[in-house]
């Protein structure tokens, strides 16, 4: 039963995501022209994102992880190829332009938003053709650490599910 519905009076007290107030383009309420999006300036991370974007293929379902893989979405759309594949993130957005930084987990011009458990059902069932994941640490044998670096315990998130079920995985990072 619902005891009460509380409507937030001050939008600043109820952000849609860490990096924005309500944005209807991230809920599917409306679409914005792709030319209106801001693209990140050239940097080492964007260069890696540009190289990784060269692995994109038409008609594939793609998962983008947190960190450097966030740049791939923007690069794909900056180059005019973002509509040729379906970009997803584990939080649930399907299609559109997945966002990075404090907006990570959202997608502008999203086509669908799945509850996260259903997104993982799709991932676990082999629905991802190509995954781009960050690597916090890698050793000479190719072992990847994404869960604990120094005193920070980030946890593995969806890394295990995605790496074990995606048809192809591309790791993105600096050394």
What is the meaning of each model-derived region?
Residues 1-33, 101-175:
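Conserved phosphate- and dinucleotide-binding cores of soluble alpha/beta proteins
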Residues 31-116:
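N-terminal active-site beta-alpha-beta segment that forms phosphate/nucleotide-binding
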